[in-house]
Amino acid sequence: MKRAFERMSMAIAIRNQQKKVKIDLRQIRRRVQKLLRLVDCREKEISLLFVDDEEIQEINQRYLGRNYPTNVISFSLSEGEFSSVNPDVLGDIVISVDTASRDAERGNIPVSDELDFLIIHGLLHILGYNHENNNPEETACMQKKEQELFFLLHGYPLDF
């Protein structure tokens, strides 16, 4: 007999605040569920916010002191002073769909693949991976994990 608590589902909050690019939110949800299983966080919670360049620039300035748009920003709630408040909440990922669209066009890949890559990238930051510390070994480790997860998600590598 199966017990109800064995089938706990992860909470994934997704909000699309931009209007320029149509995003399949159901597909995003399914892929995030799979990613959370792949990184052994199946019972964790995460939120995704899709915005335009203007909004991500405001967030980047407010929280990181960088006055320019970027492709993705992650906020980990599993480390730091608030990590014990709710250990089941991983954090938030904010993605600029404007920047993702431009990057996808430059890389000649579908926007959906670029969005999936940015979700993976943001999730890995939340999980403690880093590439911004001038450590080539950590950067290589993160890039390898990004490629691995993308392949497991899609069944093909992403060349960019």
Swiss-Prot record:
Task: Give the superkingdom in one word.
Answer: Bacteria
> What biological processes does GO assign it?
rRNA processing
Q: Which residues bind Zn(2+)?
A: 121, 125, 131
Its needed co-factors are:
Zn(2+)
Q: What is its EC number?
A: 3.1.-.-
Which SUPFAM superfamilies does this chain map to?
Answer: Metalloproteases ('zincins'), catalytic domain (SSF55486)
Q: Which GO terms describe its molecular function?
A: metalloendopeptidase activity; RNA endonuclease activity; zinc ion binding
Q: Which UniProt keywords apply?
A: Cytoplasm, Endonuclease, Hydrolase, Metal-binding, Nuclease, Ribosome biogenesis, rRNA processing, Zinc
Give the cofactor binding note.
Binds 1 zinc ion.
Which InterPro entries would you find in this protein's record?
A: MetalPrtase_cat_dom_sf_prd, YbeY, YbeY_CS
Q: Report the subcellular localization.
A: Cytoplasm
Main subcellular localisation? cytoplasm
Q: Which family does it belong to?
A: Belongs to the endoribonuclease YbeY family.
Q: What does this protein do?
A: Single strand-specific metallo-endoribonuclease involved in late-stage 70S ribosome quality control and in maturation of the 3' terminus of the 16S rRNA.
Put simply, this protein is called Endoribonuclease YbeY
- Phylogenetic placement of the source organism: Bacteria, Pseudomonadati, Thermodesulfobacteriota, Syntrophia, Syntrophales
